[in-house]
C-alpha cells in the first residue's frame, strides 16, 4: 500500500478514498483511513452482498458512518448484472434479487441522511430501478454516481437532480462516446474523477491492474472533453472532492 500511495503522491494525488464490499472489508477500509492521514473511507455493504445486511451489520455500519474518517456511505446501490451469479468472492454466495438490494439501498440512504455523509452509488444495468428509488427516498446532501457508466439520457436526468457524476477509466475507452459527452455537459460542481481500482484501468494501460496513480489519465481525458488544461481540471475535481467529502485536501 505504501508504494502505491507514494506513486499516487508523486503524480499529484492529494488523497484516497477506499472502500470495502462486505462488512469486514469495510471495517478494514476504515482502519486504513485511521492509520493513513491521506486516506479516507466510504462505508457500506456492496449491493452484491446485500443479503448480509442484517440487524447486527446495520448497527456496525451505523457506528462506522459517524466516524470522522468515514466520508461517504458507499458503495451501495443496485446491480442487476450479477443477480444469480457467483461474483467470485470467497463466501461463494450469489448476488441477491433487486428487491433485497433495494431494501439494503434504502437503509444506506437513510444512513447517509442521518450521518450527513455523501451517498456513493454503485449501479450496473439497473438505471430505471435506481432512479426510481433515489426519487422517492429521502435526499442525502450529496449523491455520487460512482464509476458512472450509464447512457446519456440517464446522465442528463441525474444531473438535473443534482447528482455528481464520477468518471473512471472507462471514459477513455474508444467506444464510450456517450460517457465523454456526459463529461462535457456536466456542470463543474457535479463532476469527479476516480480510479475504481483495481478495475477500469484507463488507456493506455487498459488491462493492467489499476491504482490511484493512473487517475491522471482519466482526468486528462475529461479535461480534453471540457476544453480545460489537465491542471485546471485537477483543481476543479479536487475542490469538488474536498467539498463533497468535507475534507481538507490542501487547496
Predicted regions and their residues:
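Mid-domain alpha/beta scaffold segments of enzyme catalytic cores
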Residues: 3-251
Amino acid at each position: 500500500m505504501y508504494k502505491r500511495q507514494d506513486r499516487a503522491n508523486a503524480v499529484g494525488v492529494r488523497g484516497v478514498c477506499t472502500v470495502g464490499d462486505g462488512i469486514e472489508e469495510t471495517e478494514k477500509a476504515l482502519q486504513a483511513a485511521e492509520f493513513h492521514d491521506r486516506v479516507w473511507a466510504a462505508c457500506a455493504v456492496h449491493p452484491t452482498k446485500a443479503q448480509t445486511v442484517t440487524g447486527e451489520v446495520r448497527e456496525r455500519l451505523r457506528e462506522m458512518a459517524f466516524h470522522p474518517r468515514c466520508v461517504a456511505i458507499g458503495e451501495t446501490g443496485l446491480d442487476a448484472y450479477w443477480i444469480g451469479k457467483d461474483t467470485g468472492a470467497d463466501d461463494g454466495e450469489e448476488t441477491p434479487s433487486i428487491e433485497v438490494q433495494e431494501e439494503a439501498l434504502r437503509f444506506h440512504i437513510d444512513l447517509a441522511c442521518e450521518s450527513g455523509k455523501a451517498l456513493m452509488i454503485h449501479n450496473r444495468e439497473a438505471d430505471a430501478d435506481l432512479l426510481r428509488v433515489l426519487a422517492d427516498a429521502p435526499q442525502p446532501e450529496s449523491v455520487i454516481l460512482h464509476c458512472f457508466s450509464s447512457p446519456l439520457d440517464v446522465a442528463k436526468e441525474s444531473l438535473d437532480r443534482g447528482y455528481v457524476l464520477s468518471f473512471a477509466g472507462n471514459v477513455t475507452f474508444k467506444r464510450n462516446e456517450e460517457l465523454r459527452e456526459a463529461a462535457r455537459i456536466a456542470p463543474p460542481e457535479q463532476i469527479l474523477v476516480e480510479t475504481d481500482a483495481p478495475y477500469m484501468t484507463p488507456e493506455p494501460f487498459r488491462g493492467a491492474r489499476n491504482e490511484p496513480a493512473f487517475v491522471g489519465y482519466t482526468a486528462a481525458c475529461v479535461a480534453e472533453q471540457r476544453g480545460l488544461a489537465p491542471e485546471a481540471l485537477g483543481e476543479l475535481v479536487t475542490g469538488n472532492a474536498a467539498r463533497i467529502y468535507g475534507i481538507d485536501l490542501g487547496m
